[in-house]
Amino acid sequence: MAENLAGNDRLIWIDLEMTGLDTDRDSIIEIATIVTDAQLNVLAEGPELAIAHPLETLEAMDEWNRNQHRRSGLWQRVIDSQVTHAQAEAQTVAFLSEWIRAGASPMCGNSICQDRRFLHRQMSRLERYFHYRNLDVSTIKELARRWAPTVANGFAKSSAHTALSDVRDSIDELRHYRQFMGALGGDTAAGVEN
């Protein structure tokens, strides 16, 4: 698929579900990726993988995570999974390498710095596949909340808290904000090319 690697403006979107937010103690339990073009059109969805963990690890999560991951079905998927962190990382890198060269895309998503911290510790090869820059939709959301609350309030996530649904939400959320960005959104009348 070498012809697929031609576009340098492709974006890799990622989301992780974890046992908690402590990057030193908690663990990745699900990963999903999507590749889009620069205009946020989905080109391909990567593997959506629940990562095997013992029941004791899940039971040690805080109440919010236990309830959320049971409700979403992720709890059972993790228990049933045979996929290790190393296998999830290898499958994800293999998928990405079909669509975009290493180092070409920023890491894209919501609160992506947290995901990067977990990847650095548990899937460092995948973390290095991304450019060092981040495209964090949460930054735009925080600015809109402060400067244009009606814009921020105009988008509602599905809040399923599964990795793939969260990736889709992040892309949809950026599409929402893009319509309010004028020339930054590709307004050719303002002399900006797409």
Swiss-Prot record:
Record-listed E.C. numbers: 3.1.15.-
One GO cellular component assignment for this chain's record is: cytoplasm
**Superkingdom:** Bacteria
Spell out the InterPro entries in the cross-references: Exonuclease_RNaseT/DNA_pol3, Oligoribonuclease, RNaseH-like_sf, RNaseH_sf
Please verify whether the record's keywords include Hydrolase. Answer: yes
Q: Which residues form the Exonuclease domain?
A: 11-174
Which keywords does this Swiss-Prot/TrEMBL entry list? Cytoplasm, Exonuclease, Hydrolase, Nuclease
Active-site residues from the entry: Y132
Spell out the subcellular localization from the entry: Cytoplasm
Q: Name one Pfam family in it.
A: RNase_T
* A Gene Ontology biological process term: DNA metabolic process
Q: Which GO terms describe its molecular function?
A: 3'-5'-RNA exonuclease activity; nucleic acid binding
- State the protein's purpose: 3'-to-5' exoribonuclease specific for small oligoribonucleotides.
Please state which protein family the record places this protein in. Belongs to the oligoribonuclease family.
Descriptive protein name: Oligoribonuclease
Give the organism, scientific name. Xanthomonas axonopodis pv. citri (strain 306)
Give the gene name: orn
